[in-house]
Swiss-Prot record:
Keywords (A to Z) from UniProt: Cytoplasm, Hydrolase, Metal-binding, Nucleotide-binding
Protein name per the record: 5'-nucleotidase SurE
Gene3D superfamilies noted in UniProt: Survival protein SurE-like phosphatase/nucleotidase
Role according to the record: Nucleotidase that shows phosphatase activity on nucleoside 5'-monophosphates.
GO molecular function, one term: 5'-nucleotidase activity
EC numbers for this chain: 3.1.3.5
GO cellular component: cytoplasm
Residues the record lists as binding a divalent metal cation: 8-9, 39, 91
Family named by the database record: Belongs to the SurE nucleotidase family.
Compartments reported by the entry: Cytoplasm
Pfam families in UniProt: SurE
Amino acid sequence: MRILISNDDGVTAPGLAALHGALVDYAECVVIAPDQDKSGAGSSLTLDRPLHPQTLANGFISLNGTPTDCVHLGLNGLLPETPDMVVSGINLGANLGDDVIYSGTVAAALEGRFLGGTSLAFSLLSRLPDNLPSAAFIARRLVEAQSRLELPPRTVLNVNIPNLPLEHIRGIQVTRLGHRARAAAPTKVVNPRGKEGYWIAVAGDAEDGGPGTDFHAVMQGYVSITPLQLDRTFNDAFEQLHGWLEGVL
């Protein structure tokens, strides 16, 4: 078993080291991660400059690109052997509901879809690393159990872990994505030379966070697992669209 590990917090992030440490004696692990924090990069690819991988003293490969770049190169010739699966994380911060649209952590796992199997993205609901050991233990157990799992090809499992010690985690729930309210307005700033700029505000609160959602599960102390797919076609809109298009052309 060969596992490609990536993240969006950057190659020196504690969550990446924790995930690698949890899996290194289970499988042959290769780490390719951004050389800096790329949170919010989504599934973007770098197309305006060459990418330069550098192998660090700990064996991790640092790349001047996005999480998707990292996995893309890892699956398309950078490595001597193609990985069997992609695992991403452990992100310090939630990736719940609409977060998956922007998340580089989730995007790295989505790029692993080309392997045909199941990829996993792990996030801890904290900006601090205190409970990373619990999250790493859970990640290891889920990666081990994944070998017994039969899901449709190209499924991604988005895993969010409560910020709790392992003994306080109540279990694991399969969930759907909730939804967030719109974020607050950006914060306007002015530099000493009078040039205006804006800081993007934090994500909105849960607007759809009831039972069955990922928001609800983690708030109740459960690990949330949400199966994701790349196909974002809104099938329920087909009938209305067909009717609307009659007579347009």
